[in-house]
């Protein structure tokens, strides 16, 4: 609870958690926010992730393998129960464990599903299942341009929305994790070839239905050191520094955010 106080003292109002933690975390989160609200103060909000373990991503499995997809679907439902204080989780599953009896759902803004996807997993899945490029669920559907991996994500999103809507009569914001390795942006042929930029995930190919009322947003990991495409792209040598600043902006963060916004993603985390 002391850490939660330090976080708010820094000026932050929202905490992101990547995976299911021990029950101590949620108990402390409940006690901290309950005390804050009783004192008439702003609580700390939570965005929760659903993790995919590294072994599954770096193994021979594709995204439709049971150890990948079914585990992701099950963990999503487990997380919903945990946040509503309706779950007991045993040791040995690669996640936190304990008796989750405190309902912290009212402070949960939404979910970020998945991790920094490995480009080889995405490419392998898309190559192996060309016939699975469509998913038409009750709460999320894919467009005609979707890939098999994006269709898998739509299924995962539809699953967590359907479960929470049906069991708890609630909905929350949903996003899918993404990062530069699998971003949907266009790069020069030289960069694409020499830097092995061969996988892409475009969440614009996943759309909500009218039944998904809460809405969704884009989640994109940005780093000051990765990728180094611009620095290593030989095409950049043909431009003066001021030309590059005008074209890309002084800040790589600013440039990437502009590119994402131009795609139509108005809300970015």
Describe each model-derived feature in a short phrase.
Residues 1-34:
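Active-site-adjacent substrate/metal-binding segments within catalytic domains
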């Amino acid at each position: 609870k002391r850490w939660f106080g330090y976080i708010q003292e820094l000026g932050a109002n929202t905490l992101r958690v990547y995976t299911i933690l021990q029950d101590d975390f949620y108990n402390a989160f409940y006690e901290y926010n309950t005390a804050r609200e009783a004192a008439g103060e702003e609580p700390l909000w939570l965005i929760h992730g659903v993790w995919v373990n590294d072994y599954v991503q770096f193994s021979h499995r594709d995204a439709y393998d049971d150890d990948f997809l079914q585990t992701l679907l099950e963990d999503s439902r487990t997380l919903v129960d945990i946040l509503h204080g309706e779950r007991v989780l045993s040791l040995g599953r690669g996640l936190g464990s304990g008796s989750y009896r405190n309902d912290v759902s009212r402070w949960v803004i939404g979910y970020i599903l998945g991790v920094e996807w490995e480009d080889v997993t995405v490419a392998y899945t898309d190559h192996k299942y060309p016939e699975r490029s469509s998913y038409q669920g009750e709460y999320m559907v894919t467009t005609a341009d979707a890939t098999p991996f994006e269709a898998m994500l739509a299924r995962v999103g539809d699953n967590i929305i359907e479960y929470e809507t049906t069991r708890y009569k609630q909905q929350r914001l949903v996003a899918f994790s993404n990062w530069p390795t699998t971003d949907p942006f266009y790069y020069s042929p030289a960069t694409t070839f020499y830097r092995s930029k061969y996988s892409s995930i475009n969440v614009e190919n996943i759309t909500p239905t009218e039944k998904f009322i809460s809405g969704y947003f884009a989640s994109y990991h940005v780093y000051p050191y990765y990728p180094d495409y611009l620095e290593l792209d030989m095409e950049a040598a043909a431009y003066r520094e001021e030309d590059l600043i005008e074209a890309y902006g002084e800040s790589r963060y600013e440039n990437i955010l502009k590119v994402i916004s131009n795609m139509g993603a108005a809300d970015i985390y």
